[in-house]
Amino acid sequence: MSDPGLVGVVGAGTMGSGIAHVFARSGFRVALCDVDTRFLERAMGQIRTNLGREASKGKLAVAEIELALERIVPTTERKDLARSAVVVEAAPERFEVKREIFRALDAILPEEAILASNTSSISITKLAAETRRADRVIGMHFFNPVPVMALVEVVRGMATSDATFAAVKELSERLGKTPVEVNDAPGFVSNRVLMPLINEAAFAVMEGVATVEAVDQVFKLGMAHPMGPLTLADFIGLDVCVDILRVLHEGIGDPKYRPCPLLVRMVDAGWLGRKAGRGFYRYEG
């Protein structure tokens, strides 16, 4: 039988650590699982830093920092997730990786447990088909930085039950998020609309229409965007953008989703954006 106070998170990268943070801050015990102890150590350090930042802004009592951290158990063993009522997968945006995780979790989780994916573009219906609990598979697409961003796209697969949707909607609200119902389609709403913008911005630079800075200024000053599309691409990660565009291109078939060759070359060069110190812009520290 599942433990209603225990949540599993698979993947201790930027998104996984942020998801673990908001669950722990909301009173849940969290099993944070990754195959690499270095990612787990980095995630725990980032969570501590972010909780401290919240406390310094008066959003969290200082005493709550240690309490929240104590609720998170980092682990490399998936068996430590076996009693979770909900598991949120936050692995890299590749179907083969997620499929293996879903199959493994389906084999060890209680029958009533919900399997959620933080995927930003991959089909929830396809992931659900890899399990024996398709009615209890759903998308929980959080946004980066997770502790700050209010939205969760709650994505219904073809077999997702009303009870599963209602449970995840309520869970999202307990985390202080606003859940928005979305049906399963490549990229859902967010990336189906956002990624063509980033892609066209990259084409504009590649074709010499404008500089990186000029493209971003057009959107910041002319359209009141808080940051330009290329700054945002660096923040998301250019490798993530290319992965999502490939999923969209394959799933929808429209050439507008074909990744800009400049984006692909930058990823090949290791210029992944802010996390790598270089993308469309250079970053220090």
Put a short name on every predicted segment:
Residues S2, A166, E173-D184, F203-E207, ...:
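NAD(P)-dependent Rossmann-like dehydrogenase/reductase catalytic/cofactor-binding core
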Residues G16-G18, K98, S120-I124:
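Short glycine/serine/threonine-rich phosphate/pyrophosphate-binding segments
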